[in-house]
A protein has these predicted regions:
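Canonical Rossmann dinucleotide-binding motif of NAD(H)/NADP(H)-dependent dehydrogenases/reductases
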Residues: 80-125
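Conserved NAD(P)H cofactor-binding loop of Rossmann-fold oxidoreductase domains
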Residues: 176-181
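Substrate-binding pocket helix/loop in short-chain dehydrogenase/reductase
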Residues: 184-185, 189-194
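Active-site loop-to-helix junction immediately N-terminal to the catalytic Tyr of the SDR YXXXK motif
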Residues: 188, 234-242
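Residue(s) in the substrate-gating loop at a strand-loop-helix junction
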Residues: 228
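SDR active-site lid
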Residues: 259-324
Length: 351
């Protein structure tokens, strides 16, 4: 069901993009409105078609489509402004070799790919992780490592002080670290639940509390929250993950609002990313079933990292659905209940 809906909506999107292209529509309307009748006859080969254009209201239809197409472009512009603290233009002056980023969970998977993409632009990166520092990153002179349990407020605060003393104040914070747990609600232990909540959600408060104040002071910064498509749809045996990623989205939305209205720092940007299935340790052992169900190959960590870092380098905030073809899933909670359940049931069969 989910695959069918995705295919239909993607087809409609492609057709709609072409049919509602304002430039093409305006050119077509201009031709029909101002073109001489003999030119219409020349191109169509029929005087009947020239008369039919007026009789059957083709010009009126084109005018309606032009209006709709312009409206869609206006909607896209407003989305861009809203995600960028109501500015259409890139924010601030960023010199990448002078910028410092903090990446939680940066030793593997998406986090590691993000670190490599950042250093490719000259950004100095502080990695916070409980995993060991991988040799591939250790040999890069602009990557620094702190072993850190980000679910501990005191640990994050102490390491934030160390980062500031060692390399300076970070202007980029990427809250990437996450944990998955394949167990049902009844099988989840209180200890594991606390660990998952600490890493996937509560840590967002700790890292932002540590690094946001200087961003506000400078009116410059970018905070990226790595959520998931699970923010929009719950999965069996991953209810904890879905609930916490929904919480991460709520955190991002509230953070962006506080930055604008409480701290009056429009130069501090926020981005939230919602990747679909990615080939990482979290999906190990399920790749074949997921790809069979979705009809697509799973994304690689580098695919997600490219989208996220491109957004950072654009100096604009955003909500990123990765890949864009699954954007429709973000609207599932507005669907009729029966359709929501059919979609959840179809996804559940892959797990």
């Amino acid at each position: 069901m989910a695959t069918l809906i995705s295919g239909v909506l993607e087809t409609l999107r492609i057709v709609g993009d072409a049919a509602l292209n304002p430039t093409l529509l305006v050119l077509a309307l201009a031709f029909l409105t101002y073109g001489l009748p003999h030119l219409i006859v020349k191109f169509t080969g029929s005087e009947f078609i020239a008369r039919w254009i007026d009789v059957f209201g083709l010009k009126t239809a084109l005018k309606a489509l032009v209006t709709l197409g312009i409206g869609l472009v206006g909607n896209q512009i407003q989305n861009l402004r809203a995600s960028n603290n109501w500015s259409l233009f890139a924010r601030g002056s960023w010199i990448w070799p002078e910028e410092i980023a903090v990446v939680t969970g940066g030793c593997n998977g998406i986090g590691k790919a993000i670190v490599l993409a950042l250093v490719g632009k000259g950004v100095r990166v502080s990695v916070l992780d409980v995993a060991d520092f991988p040799p591939e990153l250790a040999q890069i002179g602009t990557v620094f490592y702190w072993k850190c349990d980000i679910s501990s407020a005191s640990a994050v605060a102490a390491i934030a002080d160390s980062i500031r003393e060692t390399i300076g104040h970070p202007s980029i914070l990427i809250n990437n670290a996450g944990m998955a747990n394949r167990s049902s609600i009844l099988d989840l232990t209180p200890e594991k639940a606390s660990e998952l909540i600490g890493v996937n959600l509560i840590s967002l408060w700790y890292t932002v509390k540590a690094f946001l104040p200087n961003m506000i002071l400078e009116n410059k910064g970018h905070i990226v929250t790595m959520a998931s498509m699970s923010s929009f749809i719950s999965l069996p045996t991953a209810v904890d993950y879905s609930a916490l990623k929904a919480g991460a989205l709520a955190f991002h939305e509230g953070l962006a609002c506080e930055i604008r209205h409480l701290y009056k720092a429009p130069g501090v940007l926020t981005t939230v990313a919602h990747p679909m299935w990615v080939d990482t340790n979290m999906t190990k052992g399920r790749q074949e079933a997921i790809e069979r169900s979705s009809g697509n190959e799973m994304m690689k960590p580098e695919d997600v990292a490219q989208v996220v870092t491109d957004q950072i380098f654009s100096r604009r905030g955003a909500q990123l659905i990765i890949p864009p073809s699954v954007t429709w899933l973000s609207a599932v909670k507005g669907f009729p209940n029966w359709l929501q359940e059919l979609i959840r049931d179809s996804i559940a069969k892959t797990l």
